[in-house]
Amino acid sequence: MKKIIATTLACALLTSATAQAANVTLLNVSYDPTRELYKNINGAFAAQWKQKTGDNVTINMSHNGSGAQSRAIIDGLDADVATLALAYDIDAIADRAKLLPKDWQKRLPQGSTPYTSTIVFLVRKGNPWKVKDWPDLVKPGIHVVTPNPKTSGGARWSYLAAWAYAEKAPGGNKDKAKAFVANLYKHVPVLDTGARGATTTFAQRGIGDVLLSWENEAHLALEEAGGADKFQIVYPSNSILAEPPVALIDKNVGRHGTRKVAEAYLQFLYTKDAQEIEAKNFYRPRDQGVLKAHGADFPNIPLYTIDDVFGGWTKAQQVHFADGGVFDQIYKPGQ
């Protein structure tokens, strides 16, 4: 009888130990204006993972300009996943730190971009400068707020959107595009390091007449208390297809033992539930059904692509944003 009791007790203890939930922590290193998005995504994923596995998962976040975040991971910031503003910033992690394979974009659908965005104009209520399109950003006396493309992914997308407009306009070419963008930056009084800082400069500090903004960030400014009474969004005649990618940081998840959860987390971003969250946070979902359901929030304007106009991110980075590149040639602080 004692033997039976002992065996039963041992089995019960073993079952209890097996059933005990594991506690897993991930670090998502993201770009500047994704705070609200990933707060909602993380809660939904944690609940789903708990239901599926019984384990508890906590996702910690780090936010900054995309270029700054890329350099931080290269320098040792221990990310399990990176959700940055553009592919070049993850390419740099693969090339310089060898933390993930160079073909990382092939591992998830749509080039590892579960959602897209674009660049729009946020202006003050009533649009006192009557801003309608890109040429209005160089009116005499107008001030434009945009972050520093050396540190901010959104700023690079904004710069390239302006360039694409000028190059592809009737009679446009690369020389005219360079002149237009150089003129545009003469109207920029301050360069913040990231998109959220630029939004704060415009919306809270009252600096500038136009904010070059991620679409989601512009909508967020309207949704904040009193925002709809202070600001309005202007969609230009065309803009750029911004594709913020996501990636597993292989060497880090290998050391942490978090690969399974981290992979599931990134795959979750493509699910219908997550796509709905992304749409509600004003990111354009890849799921066409979800996109159609939220169509009123996403005007259909022509969007140039990085590949078609600039030959991809590697070339665009080298030509425009590397030390001594076009941006360094045209931007003179205080001019």
Feature locations, PLM:
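Ligand-binding pocket segment of bilobal, Venus flytrap-like solute-binding proteins
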Residues: 169-236
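Short beta-strand->loop
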Residues: 29-31, 123-125, 143-170, 185-188, ...
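Bacterial N-terminal signal peptides
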Residues: 6-16
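N-terminal segment of the mature folded domain
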Residues: 22-152, 295, 331-332
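Extracellular/periplasmic juxtamembrane helices and adjacent flexible linkers that interface
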Residues: 253-335
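Periplasmic-binding protein-like
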Residues: 113-117, 178-185, 192-193, 225-259, ...
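Sec/Tat signal peptide C-region and signal peptidase I cleavage site
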Residues: 17-21
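Short helix-loop capping/hinge motifs at secondary-structure junctions, enriched
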Residues: 126-132, 151, 164-172, 252-260
